[in-house]
UniProtKB/Swiss-Prot annotation:
Lineage: Eukaryota, Metazoa, Chordata, Craniata, Vertebrata
Family note: Belongs to the cytochrome b family.
Keyword Transmembrane helix attached: yes
Source organism per UniProt: Pomatostomus superciliosus
Alphabetical keyword list: Electron transport, Heme, Iron, Membrane, Metal-binding, Mitochondrion, Mitochondrion inner membrane, Respiratory chain, Transmembrane, Transmembrane helix, Transport, Ubiquinone
Protein name in the entry: Cytochrome b
Gene for this chain: MT-CYB
Coiled coil: none
Top-level taxon in the UniProt lineage: Eukaryota
């Protein structure tokens, strides 16, 4: 969905909202693509947080190198 959204998105601050409005109103099923993308991203981050919670529960933070790599990956995902 991100590739389809990126095809219609404009990063210019004066046109960004207009490009989202164009996508939702003028692109066929643009509203559906936008909603699928938003819900999919939310579900992805919920899965990430559950994975972190599982690591905390089972004490994976004791393995410092692996835990630090996981923290770096989490920060990279959020950037």
């Amino acid at each position: 969905t991100a590739l389809l959204l990126a095809a219609h998105y404009t990063a210019d601050t004066s046109l960004a909202f207009a490009s989202v409005t164009h996508m939702c109103r003028n692109v066929q099923f643009g509203w559906l693509i936008r909603n699928l993308h938003a819900n999919g991203a939310s579900f992805f981050f919920i899965c990430i947080y559950l994975h972190i919670g599982r690591g905390l529960y089972y004490g994976s933070y004791l393995n410092k190198e692996t835990w630090n790599i996981g923290v770096i990956l989490l920060l990279t995902l959020m950037a």
